[in-house]
Amino acid sequence: MMKQARSLLSRSLCDQSKSLFEASTLRGFASWSNSSTPGRGFPGKDAAKPSGRLFAPYSIFKGKAALSVEPVLPSFTEIDSGNLRIDRRGSLMMTFMPAIGERKYDWEKKQKFALSPTEVGSLISMGSKDSSEFFHDPSMKSSNAGQVRKSLSVKPHADGSGYFISLSVNNSILKTNDYFVVPVTKAEFAVMKTAFSFALPHIMGWNRLTGHVNTEALPSRNVSHLKTEPQLELEWDK
């Protein structure tokens, strides 16, 4: 059974000057920690103030390439009387890196693919014999359409033991063709699906509907309860 979902996104190209060589495995879904006992994740009444953010990407390292997945949370803008609306929608950012040696990967040649909530739903609903494929074009509705194309595919192993996750990036501007393939086991894919299900309402901003946000403590124009680094926010940042 083949299940194919096509998504053509129109986003502007922008340059990235900062390498994610050291920090890319640490940046992602951020939350505050206020544990009163070192080494334990349970807050207490005497807990110290948060000392920083916790980052928890899920990474899979294989022989020819590595894959890292991390949620990018939406940003919000205050409109009136403390009300908020989404300014930039969230996504699940998939980062692929080619191998350059045993357990060594070239972070400078990474490529990213931002999954929308609907695309996340397609992966969550996949069965053991299902496939999914997504297409992104940053200039779909302009005269530059087709100059940079990304194709992400998820296909099952013939023996049902897992999936092949591959990303193809064709850049006619730079005249480059990048291709990454990361085989994942059933267990690894199960972790991804479970994590995706947990992250989905957060990248949609729906977690705010059931939580209480003190907007007085947030910036007046562009607010985000949990922020990610700018380098993770755009799929087309290189």
Curated annotation (Swiss-Prot):
Q: Where is this protein localized, as stated in its record?
A: Mitochondrion
Keyword list (alphabetical) reads: DNA damage, DNA repair, Mitochondrion, Transit peptide
Indicate the residues annotated as transit peptide.
1-29
Which GO terms fall under molecular function for this chain's record?
A: DNA binding; mRNA binding; single-stranded DNA binding
Cite a GO CC annotation.
mitochondrion
Q: Does the keyword Nucleotide-binding apply?
A: no
Disruption of the gene: reported phenotype: No visible phenotype under normal growth conditions.
A GO term (biological process) for this protein?
defense response
Classification via Pfam families: Whirly
Q: How far does the signal peptide extend, from start to end residue?
A: none
Extract the PANTHER family matched here. SINGLE-STRANDED DNA-BINDING PROTEIN WHY2, MITOCHONDRIAL
Q: What else is known?
A: Plants over-expressing WHY2 are small with dark-green distorted leaves, exhibit early senescence and produces shorter siliques with half the amount of seeds found in wild-type plants.
Q: Quaternary structure?
A: Homotetramer.
The task this protein performs is described as: Single-stranded DNA-binding protein that associates with mitochondrial DNA and may play a role in the regulation of the gene expression machinery. Also seems to be required to prevent break-induced DNA rearrangements in the mitochondrial genome. Can bind to melt double-stranded DNA in vivo.
**Protein name per UniProt:** Single-stranded DNA-binding protein WHY2, mitochondrial
Q: What is the lineage of its organism?
A: Eukaryota, Viridiplantae, Streptophyta, Embryophyta, Tracheophyta
Q: What is the gene called?
A: WHY2
